[in-house]
Amino acid sequence: DLSLLVLDVTRGLEVQDFRIITEIRKAGKGLIILLNKWDILPNKTEKSFDHIVKDILEREPLLEYVPILSISAKEGQRLHRVIQEIRTVYENCHRVIGRERLAEVFSNLMQQNPHPSRQSRAVVLKRACQVMVEPPVISIETRTPELVDESYKRFLMKRFFEEFQLMGAPLRLNFDQKLILRKDEDLEQFTLSSNSV
């Protein structure tokens, strides 16, 4: 259900690491990034971790919602935190948000920050419904899915991650002309492995 990506912090994040991250996200798996060999990082200061995380997020902003931990597998450093994060991310990947809560958050977002018009056409996002868990998928109804702006999609993702505490989960947004409404209690049967969406 989830992947632990172990990186050699002494080498930094490489192009192949980003390819692996992309594949993990495509597969709909939760993700935790482990910066290994922290014990032998040269020139380490109190701010080293923050600088490394900042560099990672500048290269891939969506990793803001992925736990990143510094560890030493050799020394057993912070491995208890890894276990805690595994539990949290697993729960987040299987979270049922709740129709009423999602409707409330979505309505507030649309009132405060509606989608801007594009190509002289209004882009109206009508309603949202969670249609799947493992990974969590939120479907949003609109007559013009092709006009939904990429930056607005990122805005919605950011707000949903924050509002619904989905750290590490591979949240997906679908924009559809017709919404399939599902009951919260039925969501467990709709997973990527069941090919139900």
Residue ranges and their predicted role:
Residues 5, 11-197:
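C-terminal-of-GTPase-core extension/linker across diverse P-loop GTPases
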Residues 1:
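Conserved acidic residues
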